[in-house]
A protein has these predicted regions:
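Amphipathic alpha-helical coiled-coil segments
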Residues: 1-63, 70-81
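Terminal intrinsically disordered/low-complexity segments used for targeting and assembly
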Residues: 82-87
Length: 87
């Protein structure tokens, strides 16, 4: 019924959020690599830019871990809504 529908919707939302976060992590990884390259090979980039890029990447990676947890929790909730055993 409604509980299964809600649990399934929550799972799909968590799945989409994780996919978007994975893209964000990839983009920030690329940005960090480019920033490090510019820092090492030019005089146009400060070390602060490298640190900022690292901080952004680490923050996104932490958010990705939280998104993965939310997806697992949503899967458990869906399993339980379908009549599975409680954990």
């Amino acid at each position: 019924g409604q509980e299964v529908s809600n649990a399934l919707n929550s799972y799909h939302v968590a799945e989409q959020q994780q996919a978007h976060r994975e893209q964000e992590v990839q983009l920030l990884t690329d940005a960090l690599e480019k920033t490090q390259f510019l820092f090492q090979h030019t005089n146009n980039t400060s070390y602060l830019s490298v640190l900022t890029a690292q901080q952004s990447l680490l923050s996104a990676q932490l958010s990705l871990i939280n998104d993965k947890y939310a997806k697992v929790q949503a899967a458990i909730n869906l399993y339980q809504a379908l009549g599975g055993a409680s954990f």
